[in-house]
Amino acid sequence: DRICTGITSSNSPHVVKTATQGEVNVTGVIPLTTTPTKSHFANLKGTKTRGKLCPKCLNCTDLDVALGRPKCMGTIPSAKASILYEVKPVTSGCFPIMHDRTKXRQLPNLLRGYENIRLSTHNVINAETAPGGPYKVGTSGSCPNVTNGNGFFATMAWAVPKNDNNKTATNPLTVEVPYICTEGEDQITVWGFHSDNETQMVKLYGDSKPQKFTSSANGVTTHYVSQIGGFPNQAEDGGLPQSGRIVVDYMVQKSGKTGTITYQRGILLPQKVWCASGRSKVIKGSLPLIGEADCLHEKYGGLNKSKPYYTGEHAKAIGNCPIWVKTPLKLANGTKYRPPAKLLKER
């Protein structure tokens, strides 16, 4: 007879690293990691995902929507997740804006971080009777409205002195900006100022000197001094060439809190304000959103979770996502490998 000892075994290609014994050969493993491949971005399963701020606002940038460009007014859908598809938001196609002087480019991204966003139905200030008035509300051929007449941003009123009596230099004036949102939301109040060459400044405002502006809300105070002249003619989206520029900024007012704006000539007074609440998780990505995915990953796009861990590029991800690990993980589902048993000699 032949007597065999040991267990049935075969060659084992599986090696796992253990905490106590280092590398160990085992008879079977279950892979716990995957290495994703890049894919398009998708809607996050089980939640609303926002791409463009206003999907139905055609030929509009998100900054157009955020500022209330006349032909870019529409509903911003609620969303628990948002795609930051403009890493550096493009300009608005209305009046030429001096973007680099303020944080105006950040406004669309600020709005994107809220779950619910709506524009107020009425104005926060009566611009025509504001201090330093009476004013007429200025419009521009560079900002055509829906009937192709002259228009301007819905979030601001261009306060131009109404008659020669108040078309003069003025000491700084202050206007209070009340809180008008009705559901305890954050109020995002947009304001700004216009400046031009000396000739146009005298024609519009009766003063060609640099003007001073200050906003204050929620403990944040910002100061500006306008630049006079030195601007080349510039047209936006085929509008009329403009020698002037506007500077646009915003302030965030918490529930019930009043803000203030101190200004001289050329002020763009706040009008309709954004009322925003809830949080939307924001991730850098690209449009369009195609289909659905368990996870949105900045480097790989939409991922469906097939394993609990992944290797590859480590980046921000939202949703039901695998966990990043540096090296592949395996779960041993067999026994420690033993070499084939040797046969004992026949007796």
Curated annotation (Swiss-Prot):
Compartment(s) of residence: Virion membrane; Host apical cell membrane
PTM: In natural infection, inactive HA is matured into HA1 and HA2 outside the cell by one or more trypsin-like, arginine-specific endoprotease secreted by the bronchial epithelial cells. One identified protease that may be involved in this process is secreted in lungs by club cells. Palmitoylated.
Pfam short name (any one): Hemagglutinin
InterPro entries: Capsid_hemagglutn (IPR008980), Hemagglutn_HA1_a/b_dom_sf (IPR013828), Hemagglutn_influenz_A/B (IPR001364)
Gene Ontology terms: biological process: fusion of virus membrane with host endosome membrane; fusion of virus membrane with host plasma membrane; symbiont entry into host cell; virion attachment to host cell
Key words, A-Z: Disulfide bond, Fusion of virus membrane with host endosomal membrane, Fusion of virus membrane with host membrane, Glycoprotein, Hemagglutinin, Host cell membrane, Host membrane, Host-virus interaction, Lipoprotein, Membrane, Palmitate, Transmembrane, Viral attachment to host cell, Viral envelope protein, Viral penetration into host cytoplasm, Virion, Virus entry into host cell
Membrane topology annotation: Single-pass type I membrane protein
Entry GO MF terms: host cell surface receptor binding
Record: glycosylation sites: N25, N59, N145, N166, N304, N333
Signal peptide positions (record): none
Cited Gene3D superfamilies: 3.90.209.20, Hemagglutinin Chain A, Domain 2
GO cellular component annotations of the record: host cell plasma membrane; membrane; viral envelope; virion membrane
Superkingdom, taxonomy of origin: Viruses
Main location: virion
Family the entry assigns: Belongs to the influenza viruses hemagglutinin family.
Protein purpose: Binds to sialic acid-containing receptors on the cell surface, bringing about the attachment of the virus particle to the cell. Plays a major role in the determination of host range restriction and virulence. Class I viral fusion protein. Responsible for penetration of the virus into the cell cytoplasm by mediating the fusion of the membrane of the endocytosed virus particle with the endosomal membrane. Low pH in endosomes induce an irreversible conformational change in HA2, releasing the fusion hydrophobic peptide. Several trimers are required to form a competent fusion pore.
Other observations noted: Major glycoprotein, comprises over 80% of the envelope proteins present in virus particle. The extent of infection into host organism is determined by HA. Influenza viruses bud from the apical surface of polarized epithelial cells (e.g. bronchial epithelial cells) into lumen of lungs and are therefore usually pneumotropic. The reason is that HA is cleaved by tryptase clara which is restricted to lungs. However, HAs of H5 and H7 pantropic avian viruses subtypes can be cleaved by furin and subtilisin-type enzymes, allowing the virus to grow in other organs than lungs.
Subunit details: Homotrimer of disulfide-linked HA1-HA2.
Protein name: Hemagglutinin
Gene: HA
